[in-house]
């Protein structure tokens, strides 16, 4: 997405062909463009995605047309789809863990992780489950279904789009200049988040890892920088995906709603990666009984869902612990009413501290590194509070931190909204979007390519 070839060659060519193609052929154009887009970076793993599309398409039809074998068709789609995800993403993790516990020496498979497999697998699963539940009819057109699963704006890193949310638009979507303009604005805002904010925070994170400089302040700068980096990186991709979807006539679900304004961890997860949280709620948590079970069964449901949420993000123990950490925090908020009675400022501060520290665990390459990072944050091992080099980096990145903090709130959005409908507002918006495109292009031409963090999931 955030590359010169995509912005100035692939995207204009696809949009030109798409809008010149008659309505009946538009989904075929999208499917072909999406397969080219995926094959551009993962050609040898493209057949895996095509197979998953074909599998869930056939299973969806089987579920709808069969009276006695609906569950068999559903289980087939779930077992094979989850099996493929498990083999490619988790096989080495489980083999390595088994070897460590038992002393065995089972060789690792070293399989390449297909880009976006967690996202398109969850989309396919939600489709077959919804067809089984009778929530949606099966899609009869393989081209339409393939376009839904492989749709290039959100294929790689979400949001996780459910078939039910865009079923009508797959066949009867509307296009307009207003939709296209709104979509392009959203796309450019997302591009700016990624290129100007996320990538520059990534530079500071790289400096922290490579400089060898250790002080308590530098560890905290790193922790806050990564929390802002992952937010702008992931929400930037979501903005770009939602914006491009709007240009093409689709209305994807929102994926972020200023999560760092949350007053509780529960609220944070209603605002962060919304499509993933709702997916686990509707397809795992509620089918397990949700909160309508005994207290200890409910606790087990919470622990299971959040362990799976952690594993969804990556095949490593730090992700498992990251998920269980949030499970513990959510349970604490339910069991300790005093947390909700704290003054708003204290509740907000506790959530920010918990989230920032959780992302230190999330970003660690190993549990050993996580332990080292936490020790540094709290000054263990005789670390100095600060140093001349740390203060230099703080001054150098102070403006970026201010922009990042402001950008994680609706301050800019609210200011722009107050100027909606005015001539000055229209001129300023157009100038701002043009300037944003120019600045982002300059960054992309001058710098090295920095992939989105969630591509690896």
For the regions a language model picked out, list residue spans one by one:
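Membrane-embedded transmembrane alpha-helical bundles that form the catalytic cores
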Residues: 1-456
